[in-house]
């Protein structure tokens, strides 16, 4: 068996817990890199993306995506797109990332925008 990094172990642990709690709700999946942050709502049953937002979107592209303010903006835009798609309840998938900094800012902004998790 291949040796898993701490990040990969954490990701597996989070995904396993999500499967138990999902109950048919879409998954709000978050990924961050050194420069950008990405978020999408995924319907795992159908295998489709319902809504997505990132710091690479055209209206935000000129700004840096490596700040908590940018992450909060992505969270607000994702919540608006989710409302437009008719989604209010989701399961938050932080992947292997700690719930801190940009991930927390995105989650808080999505909650303020009307998503429940």
From Swiss-Prot:
CDD domains: Ribosomal_L18_L5e. Disulfide bonds: none annotated. One of its GO terms (molecular function) is structural constituent of ribosome. Pfam families: Ribosomal_L18p (PF00861). The keyword Lipoprotein does not apply. One of its GO terms (cellular component) is cytosolic large ribosomal subunit. SUPFAM superfamilies: Translational machinery components (SSF53137). One of its GO terms (biological process) is translation. Keywords: Ribonucleoprotein, Ribosomal protein, RNA-binding, rRNA-binding. The keyword Glycoprotein does not apply. Part of the 50S ribosomal subunit; part of the 5S rRNA/L5/L18/L25 subcomplex. Contacts the 5S and 23S rRNAs. This is one of the proteins that bind and probably mediate the attachment of the 5S RNA into the large ribosomal subunit, where it forms part of the central protuberance. Belongs to the universal ribosomal protein uL18 family. This is Large ribosomal subunit protein uL18. The gene is rplR.
């Amino acid at each position: 068996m291949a040796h898993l990094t701490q990040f990969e172990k954490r990701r597996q642990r989070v995904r396993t817990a999500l499967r138990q709690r999902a109950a048919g709700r879409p998954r709000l999946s978050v990924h961050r890199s050194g420069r950008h942050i990405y978020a999408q709502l995924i319907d795992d049953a159908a295998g489709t993306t319902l809504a997505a937002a990132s710091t690479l979107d055209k209206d935000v592209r000129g700004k840096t995506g490596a700040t908590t303010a940018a992450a909060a903006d992505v969270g607000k835009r994702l919540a608006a797109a989710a409302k437009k798609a008719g989604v209010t309840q989701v399961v938050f998938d932080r992947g292997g990332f700690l719930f801190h900094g940009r991930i927390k800012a995105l989650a808080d902004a999505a909650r303020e925008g009307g998503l429940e998790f």
